[in-house]
Design a protein with these regions (language model features):
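Prokaryotic Sec-type signal peptides and long signal-anchor helices
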Residues: 9, 18, 29-30
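Extracellular, repeat-based ectodomains that mediate carbohydrate processing or recognition
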Residues: 33-442
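Hydrophobic h-region of N-terminal signal peptides that target proteins for export
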Residues: 24-32
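A periodicity- and composition-biased signal for non-globular, repetitive helical segments
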Residues: 10, 22-23
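Secreted/luminal cysteine- and crosslink-motif detector
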Residues: 11-13, 28, 217
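Amphipathic, positively biased hydrophobic alpha-helical segments used for protein targeting
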Residues: 23-24, 304
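N-terminal secretory signal peptides that target proteins for export/translocation
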Residues: 1-15
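Sec-dependent signal peptide recognition
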Residues: 16-22
Length: 442
């Protein structure tokens, strides 16, 4: 009897050891799919999310093997930094410029033009345009602040740069206040080194509402999607709309190739996906395009009890939706100001048959997480990129590097965000760039 008991105990112990080893193996194997490299840039302001809001466009950009980034330091000064992609060492400069970091809308947007000059815009929330560019090619030292065209530059919010395949640079922003703003688009020509107005009112809120958009540049043109907001209250967000330009932003059309009469209004906008008000529909997320030029729009809203990430995409002329359903705790989006939300807005990428979502979720410990699915299977897998919390971080990635080399570099900082534009009391946190060496491909 004792021998049988000892033998059973040994077998049980052996099985448990094997199970532990097996689990460890699978954990290591899963982690091996996401080998990362981290480089530290410097200490940044972290009492709110101004350094990491998703609508920076861009926080990180690469031009000819030189990667640039920008952030506010603990004193609210703009820090510009660059490195060679083969190095973890960053060259930094504290500029003479600063911003009102107490408002998380006042983010920094950067781009490098085709002549290798750095362009920077910052510190704007229904305030005057703030813009400067580097004195030298690939330089970090900025010249004097300047206007672009002088028109529609007194009430600027959400500045963002976009590089076009033809070498021109786009600058987009909202002119006017929340709930009654219009979309402005300007174009920079490297030959003349001058800005011109491309669209003085691409999307018109008709003084009744605002469009909150995201932009993607693909080989075939410029893609824009947006939600409408009927007031300052985020709960009035509704509908996901769409437009495309094949000529650098001069003319726009629907997915059916029907030409828009500009400006686009609520009555004329193509609705890619109908979402009613009070659905906790988030604004200003991300979009991408596949090799065939089909757009993919990421977001989240509540259509079944709990807000979940979703992807709306175009395939063979028809709009489709992919759901996720891993978030378990309900929450409601409502009110104004920068919100403290349990999940970040998502960033989306696609490569061949694979679709990727980059996000943060309190239920996963506020770590940076990568979701992946094969479009043929539509089964999601989730892997944490970091082993530590990044607080109220939202994803910003190097889109130029991704488009050129399919390499994923992420701007990262552990930040806080009190609800409604409040401030936390946090020690300055390190700004990092995280490189994912190999993405899941099945």
């Amino acid at each position: 009897m004792l021998e049988k008991f000892s033998d059973s105990l040994y077998k049980c112990s052996f099985s448990r050891k094997n199970l532990v080893l097996l689990l460890l193996f699978f954990c290591v194997a899963a982690h091996a799919q996401l080998k990362t490299n981290e480089s530290e840039v410097g200490l940044g302001w972290s009492n709110n999310s101004v350094n990491t809001v998703i609508f920076r466009n861009s926080a990180l950009t690469t031009f000819k093997n030189w990667q640039f980034t920008a952030y506010y330091n603990p004193e609210g000064k703009i820090v510009l930094a660059k490195r060679n992609l083969n190095s973890n060492q960053w060259e930094k400069i504290i500029t003479p410029y600063s911003g009102n970091v107490k408002d998380a809308h006042n983010c920094i947007s950067i781009a490098v033009d085709a002549d290798s000059f750095l362009h920077v815009s910052w510190d704007q929330h229904d305030t005057r345009l703030r813009y400067a560019k580097s004195k030298m090619p690939l330089g970090l030292e900025l010249g004097e602040e300047q206007s672009m065209t002088g028109n529609d530059e007194s009430k600027v919010t959400y500045p963002e740069f976009h590089n076009l395949p033809n070498g021109k640079l786009l600058f987009c922003y909202r002119s006017g206040a929340s709930g009654r703003g219009n979309m402005i688009v300007k174009s920079y020509d490297v030959k003349t080194r001058k800005w011109t107005s491309l669209q003085n009112n691409l999307i018109n809120g008709e003084n009744q509402r605002s469009a909150y958009w995201q932009i993607c540049v693909g080989k075939k043109g410029i893609y824009v999607s947006w939600v409408w907001r009927e007031s300052w209250d985020v709960s009035t967000n509704h509908d996901i709309c769409y437009a495309f330009s094949a000529d650098g932003g001069q003319t726009w059309e629907k997915s059916t190739a029907e030409k828009y009469s500009l400006p686009i209004t609520k009555a004329t906008a193509e609705i890619a996906w109908k979402v009613p008000e009070k659905s906790s529909l988030i604004n200003q997320t991300s979009m991408t395009v596949d090799a065939q030029g089909n757009p993919y729009i990421a977001g989240y809203w509540n259509d079944n009890g709990v807000p979940q990430y979703k992807v709306v995409y175009l395939d063979k002329g028809k709009w489709n939706k992919i759901d996720t359903d891993f978030h378990t705790k309900p929450f409601v989006l409502g009110g104004g100001g920068t919100k403290r939300i349990p999940i970040s807005r998502p960033e989306i990428l696609t490569n061949k048959s694979m679709l990727y979502l980059l996000f943060r979720d309190e239920e996963r410990g506020n770590k940076i997480t990568l979701g992946s699915t094969n479009l043929g299977k539509k089964q999601w897998k989730f892997t944490d990129v970091t082993e530590y919390s990044v607080g109220q971080w939202e994803p910003n990635l190097d889109k130029e590097l991704w488009n050129d080399k399919l390499e994923l570099h992420i701007f990262s900082q552990n930040v806080s965000q009190a609800d409604g534009e409040g401030l936390a009391e946090e020690e300055p946190q390190t700004v990092r760039v995280i490189e994912i060496k190999k993405l899941p491909n099945n």
